[in-house]
Amino acid sequence: MRVVGLSEDDGGPGPTRVFAHRLVHGTDPAVVAHDAGWTVVKPLTATREEDGEIVLTLLVRPLDGERRPHEPGRGRDAGLELPPGAEPEVRQRVAAYAVVLSERGLLATEYSDRTAVPGRWGMPGGGIDDGEQPADAVLREVGEETDQTVVLDELVSVQTSHWVGRSPRGTLEDFQAVRLVYRATCPEPREPRVLDVGGTTESARWVPLAEWPTLSWTHNWEQLLGSLLP
């Protein structure tokens, strides 16, 4: 993934590109911006270029005393035991998710026992296939995990996590998740059902907005929803 910063602070007729850097494994895009002398105002777009690389474009402004964003470091799956001399496979995975609202509330998905957080809840979405645009990926994933048709809105957040654990296939990985999070609406909500049976999604449901804090969310999703929802 490549991270590009655009600034409107030069007085020109439109945003100016002020940096473009590759996202080093384990690093957050906000740290990339800070180390280049900028702070993130908001994410703008995420697109796959002709060379196959995903480019994340951020609106930024010059640093004005902001501290370097905190990076929690590399975690580890609970209960994971590393054999002596084990070398995890380094993997950076870019995925796309949607915070979907409808007249029935918030669309939520429950993680299956193929994940490290079975029984916890998150947003529908998942990995971006080779050659696929992030916006197309999130529409596909929402359909596979919930059987809903949604209308995508703006990119609202970029989250990263970094840990050592085992993939659903059992591979030991030094894994960085980069999550592109969009807003979306569902004009014609129906009863959710998981079409991709046997994957990382156990179930899906509509949650009335007043009740969303009662679910057992993963930490990252709970934090994000607290900033986006009433």
Predicted ranges, named:
Residues 1-56, 60:
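Intrinsically disordered, low-complexity, charged terminal extensions of DNA damage-control enzymes
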Residues 1-18, 82-122, 150-154, 186:
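N-terminal strand-loop-strand
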Residues 22-41, 123-156:
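The catalytic Nudix box helix
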Residues 47-99:
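Acidic, metal-coordinating catalytic segment for phosphate/diphosphate chemistry
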Residues 48-55, 87-89, 159-179:
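Acidic pyrophosphate-coordinating catalytic loop
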Residues 59, 100, 181-185, 205-208:
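Short, well-ordered beta-strand micro-motif
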Residues 175-190:
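Phosphate/ribose-recognition catalytic cores of enzymes acting on nucleotide-derived substrates
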